[in-house]
Amino acid sequence: MKDVQRIALLFDFYGPLLTERQQELIRAYYLEDHSLAEIADADGVSRQAVHELIRRSEAALQEYEQRLGFVAEHQRRLRLLDELQEALDRADLSAARRALAALRAEA
Protein backbone atom coordinates (compact mmCIF):
# COMPACT_ATOMS: atom_id res chain seq x y z
CA MET A 1 0.00 0.00 0.00
CA LYS A 2 1.34 3.43 -0.88
CA ASP A 3 2.40 5.67 2.00
CA VAL A 4 -0.29 8.27 1.31
CA GLN A 5 -3.00 5.62 1.23
CA ARG A 6 -1.64 3.96 4.35
CA ILE A 7 -1.49 7.22 6.30
CA ALA A 8 -5.00 8.13 5.12
CA LEU A 9 -6.31 4.76 6.30
CA LEU A 10 -4.51 5.05 9.63
CA PHE A 11 -5.90 8.56 9.98
CA ASP A 12 -9.43 7.26 9.36
CA PHE A 13 -9.06 4.86 12.26
CA TYR A 14 -6.84 6.76 14.68
CA GLY A 15 -7.11 10.43 13.68
CA PRO A 16 -9.27 11.33 16.69
CA LEU A 17 -6.45 10.15 18.96
CA LEU A 18 -4.12 12.81 17.58
CA THR A 19 -4.04 16.37 18.86
CA GLU A 20 -6.06 18.92 16.92
CA ARG A 21 -2.84 20.36 15.51
CA GLN A 22 -1.65 16.95 14.35
CA GLN A 23 -5.03 16.29 12.76
CA GLU A 24 -4.91 19.62 10.93
CA LEU A 25 -1.44 18.93 9.55
CA ILE A 26 -2.18 15.36 8.45
CA ARG A 27 -5.40 16.55 6.83
CA ALA A 28 -3.68 19.43 5.01
CA TYR A 29 -0.65 17.45 3.87
CA TYR A 30 -2.13 14.07 3.01
CA LEU A 31 -5.81 14.63 2.35
CA GLU A 32 -5.77 18.13 0.86
CA ASP A 33 -2.36 17.68 -0.81
CA HIS A 34 -0.81 20.93 0.43
CA SER A 35 2.96 21.18 0.31
CA LEU A 36 5.07 21.61 3.41
CA ALA A 37 5.89 25.14 2.26
CA GLU A 38 2.22 26.03 1.80
CA ILE A 39 1.34 24.77 5.26
CA ALA A 40 4.33 26.52 6.81
CA ASP A 41 3.48 29.83 5.12
CA ALA A 42 -0.16 29.64 6.20
CA ASP A 43 0.82 28.86 9.79
CA GLY A 44 3.75 31.25 10.01
CA VAL A 45 6.23 28.53 10.95
CA SER A 46 9.21 26.96 9.26
CA ARG A 47 8.90 24.21 6.71
CA GLN A 48 11.11 22.08 8.97
CA ALA A 49 8.73 22.55 11.91
CA VAL A 50 5.82 21.36 9.79
CA HIS A 51 7.85 18.42 8.50
CA GLU A 52 8.84 17.32 12.00
CA LEU A 53 5.30 17.53 13.35
CA ILE A 54 3.92 15.59 10.40
CA ARG A 55 6.56 12.89 10.91
CA ARG A 56 5.74 12.70 14.63
CA SER A 57 2.06 12.47 13.77
CA GLU A 58 2.76 9.66 11.30
CA ALA A 59 4.78 7.86 13.96
CA ALA A 60 1.89 8.22 16.42
CA LEU A 61 -0.53 6.74 13.88
CA GLN A 62 1.85 3.84 13.23
CA GLU A 63 2.25 3.30 16.96
CA TYR A 64 -1.52 3.16 17.48
CA GLU A 65 -1.79 0.57 14.73
CA GLN A 66 1.07 -1.46 16.14
CA ARG A 67 -0.59 -1.53 19.55
CA LEU A 68 -4.24 -1.86 18.51
CA GLY A 69 -4.16 -3.47 15.06
CA PHE A 70 -7.54 -2.16 13.92
CA VAL A 71 -6.41 -1.47 10.36
CA ALA A 72 -4.86 -4.92 9.97
CA GLU A 73 -8.03 -6.51 11.30
CA HIS A 74 -10.16 -4.40 8.98
CA GLN A 75 -8.05 -5.44 5.99
CA ARG A 76 -8.21 -9.10 7.03
CA ARG A 77 -12.00 -8.93 7.20
CA LEU A 78 -12.15 -7.27 3.80
CA ARG A 79 -10.08 -10.14 2.38
CA LEU A 80 -12.48 -12.66 3.93
CA LEU A 81 -15.42 -10.82 2.42
CA ASP A 82 -13.68 -10.88 -0.97
CA GLU A 83 -13.12 -14.62 -0.61
CA LEU A 84 -16.76 -15.09 0.30
CA GLN A 85 -17.90 -13.09 -2.71
CA GLU A 86 -15.59 -15.03 -5.03
CA ALA A 87 -16.83 -18.35 -3.64
CA LEU A 88 -20.42 -17.26 -4.11
CA ASP A 89 -19.67 -16.09 -7.65
CA ARG A 90 -18.22 -19.54 -8.41
CA ALA A 91 -21.14 -21.19 -6.62
CA ASP A 92 -18.54 -22.89 -4.41
CA LEU A 93 -20.68 -23.30 -1.34
CA SER A 94 -18.08 -25.10 0.77
CA ALA A 95 -15.59 -22.26 0.28
CA ALA A 96 -18.34 -19.73 0.98
CA ARG A 97 -19.23 -21.55 4.20
CA ARG A 98 -15.57 -21.54 5.31
CA ALA A 99 -15.23 -17.80 4.68
CA LEU A 100 -18.51 -17.13 6.44
CA ALA A 101 -17.44 -19.26 9.40
CA ALA A 102 -14.20 -17.30 9.65
CA LEU A 103 -16.14 -14.05 9.73
CA ARG A 104 -18.58 -15.39 12.31
CA ALA A 105 -15.74 -16.54 14.52
CA GLU A 106 -14.72 -12.90 14.80
CA ALA A 107 -18.15 -11.69 15.91
Curated annotation (Swiss-Prot):
Protein family (similarity comment): Belongs to the UPF0122 family.
InterPro entries registered for this protein in UniProt: RNA_pol_sigma_r3/r4-like, UPF0122, UPF0122_fam_protein, WH-like_DNA-bd_sf
Biological role: Might take part in the signal recognition particle (SRP) pathway. This is inferred from the conservation of its genetic proximity to ftsY/ffh. May be a regulatory protein.
The organism's place on the tree of life at top rank: Bacteria
NCBIfam families on file: YlxM
Pfam families: UPF0122
Name the UniProt record assigns to this protein: UPF0122 protein STH1464
PANTHER family to which the protein is assigned, alphabetical: UPF0122 PROTEIN CBO2450/CLC_2298 (PTHR40083), UPF0122 PROTEIN YLXM (PTHR40083:SF1)
